[in-house]
Amino acid sequence: MVLIIRPSQTLILFRKAMLKPIGRYPLKRNFFGLSGTNHTIREQRYVLRKAINAPPSTVYAAVSEVAQYKEFIPYCVDSFVDKRNPVDNKPLIAGLRVGFKQYDEEFICNVTCKDTDHTYTVVAETISHNLFHLLISKWTIMPHPNRPNAAMVELLLRFKFKSRIYNSVSLIFAKTVTELVMNAFAKRAYHLVRLAMLKPSSKEGSP
């Protein structure tokens, strides 16, 4: 779910050199088309922590509402929720579709959202395995220890491509991807804060 990035020179060269047509969608291509032997590929992990100037509940709202990803994540052409928790209405099964020119991929994930003692977690694990042996993202959101109305956010990304080549090349850009995703959510959370501030108070207009 987190491999949605703005193209950079490295990524453009990467695509030109490595991408092959698959034909999954009409007039489209898959991002990745190579396969490898599972035992030769190692799982990769990236952890990024960032202070975000928004309350933890606002950051949690931005991260957990997958259906809105298409509104603010670059090249996310569609995002959706197939199943929600009947108790809190948070996603249980969700997905997104990433498109860039003629390339197209869709990710479906099991999603687990938890709110425990002012600490929020959102875990997404892919159940569509055309690209990865493993793809898991975990967001941990908690109050900032020194700044009121701010959050301390950690994003853990674990993945293992089916392709040995892509698993190796990903070492070049995975850290940048993680940072871009974190920044996209930071901007989204700030946007939600501004919307809340501009929303008329329920007391306005009362006699």
From Swiss-Prot:
Q: What are this entry's molecular-function GO terms?
A: molecular carrier activity; ubiquinone binding
UniProt feature coiled coil, ranges: none
UniProt key word Zinc = no
Where is it localised? Mitochondrion inner membrane
Q: Which domain of life is it from?
A: Eukaryota
Q: Which UniProt keywords apply?
A: Membrane, Mitochondrion, Mitochondrion inner membrane, Transit peptide
Q: Which InterPro entries match?
A: COQ10-like, COQ10_START, START-like_dom_sf
Gene Ontology, cellular component aspect: mitochondrial inner membrane; mitochondrion
| One Pfam family here | Polyketide_cyc
Q: Which CDD domains match?
A: COQ10p_like
**Per UniProt, what is the membrane topology?**
Peripheral membrane protein
Q: Which GO terms describe its biological process?
A: cellular respiration; ubiquinone biosynthetic process
Question: What SUPFAM superfamilies does the annotation carry?
Answer: Bet v1-like
Q: Where is the transit peptide?
A: 1-39
Q: Per the similarity annotation, which family is this? A: Belongs to the COQ10 family.
Q: Which PANTHER family match?
A: COENZYME Q-BINDING PROTEIN COQ10, MITOCHONDRIAL, SPERM PROTEIN HOMOLOG
What does it do?
Required for the function of coenzyme Q in the respiratory chain. May serve as a chaperone or may be involved in the transport of Q6 from its site of synthesis to the catalytic sites of the respiratory complexes.
Known partners and oligomeric status: Interacts with coenzyme Q.
Q: What is this protein called?
A: Coenzyme Q-binding protein COQ10, mitochondrial
Organism field: Saccharomyces cerevisiae (strain ATCC 204508 / S288c)
